[in-house]
Design a protein with these regions (language model features):
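N-terminal cap/lid segment of alpha/beta-hydrolase-fold proteins
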Residues: 1-26
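Short alpha-helix in the alpha/beta-hydrolase fold that links the catalytic acid
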Residues: 47, 184, 198-207
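Conserved alpha/beta-hydrolase
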Residues: 48-70
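Catalytic nucleophile-loop/oxyanion-hole region of alpha/beta-hydrolase
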Residues: 66-95, 99
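Hydrolase active-site cap/lid region
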Residues: 114-169
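Short beta-strand/loop motif that positions the catalytic acidic residue
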Residues: 181-183, 188-190, 194
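Acidic catalytic loop of the alpha/beta-hydrolase fold
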Residues: 192-197, 224-225
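Catalytic histidine-centered segment of alpha/beta-hydrolase-like enzymes
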Residues: 221-235
Length: 248
């Protein structure tokens, strides 16, 4: 279904040609769907189908340095937040009246949260962030400690290199700081058994968010598995949240 129904679309962002799949539906509701680290848009096919069946037009995007998009470096959401603005612009070129929700899983969740702190068009009505991390720095420290690898001074050096080469360090790449500025209603989702992005980050992000907000905890769900572990709870919560901000 995904391969048959989707139309390839492209934007240029930061001089990179980025790829997405567009799934046309009637009406002006759009879901912009963002995958996780080292994944690709087509791995989000289940989410795409859910939104499509609910009547949404769907745009599933390959993040820079993933899938069919150009790029040599994965930015963990920070440069990617600008790419999200580019995709929103493309949607508005198709339909100036578009009502857009941003949905991301893992790094995709961090990306849409980082984007939410920017000045986005009023067309963006809601954000759904499934197991996003607080910042690139926090995530790397968590992973190092989980693997019992000393993170100092390697992480500090890598962060400095990123600052020199790419213009930002790992602490700047912060969803936590961005949600403090967000005015877009946000649903935070996290599984209690997430070992890759710790469950405690849900609480930190939720507390920091300045926007209207809700949170969903999925008991027993590991990383990025909330929708598989309890699909009924996941999608009924998403459905209610969406209806609140863009109607049924």
């Amino acid at each position: 279904w995904y391969a048959d129904e989707g139309e390839d679309v492209y934007i240029i962002s930061d001089s990179l040609r980025l790829h997405g799949k567009r799934f046309k539906n009637s009406g002006s509701d759009y879901a912009l769907v963002c995958h996780g680290y080292t994944s690709k848009a087509k791995h989000m096919a289940g989410f795409v189908k859910k939104f499509y069946d609910r009547g949404f037009n769907v745009l599933a995007v390959d993040a820079r340095a993933h899938g069919d998009s150009e790029g040599a470096k994965i930015g963990m959401g920070w440069p990617e937040r600008r790419d999200i603005a580019g995709w929103i612009k493309l949607i508005l070129s198709w339909d100036p009246d578009a009502r857009i929700i941003l949905h991301g899983v893992s790094m995709g969740a961090a990306t849409v949260l980082m984007a939410s702190g920017e000045t986005l068009p009023e067309n963006v009505k809601a954000v759904i962030a499934d197991c996003g991390y607080t910042s690139e720095w926090d995530e790397f420290i968590w992973e190092a400690e989980t693997l019992h690898i000393p993170w100092f001074p390697v992480l500090n050096a890598a962060s400095l290199l990123s600052k020199l080469r790419d213009g930002y360090d790992f602490k700047q790449a912060s969803a936590l700081d961005q949600v403090k500025k967000s005015r877009i209603p946000t649903l935070f989702i996290h599984g209690t058994e997430d070992e890759l992005v710790p469950y405690k980050m849900l609480g930190e992000l939720y507390l920091a968010a300045a926007c209207e907000k809700e949170k969903l905890t999925v008991e027993g769900a590991g990383h990025a598995l909330s929708s598989s572990v309890d699909p009924e709870l996941y999608w009924s919560t998403v459905e209610r949240f969406i209806e609140k901000y863009i109607g049924s």
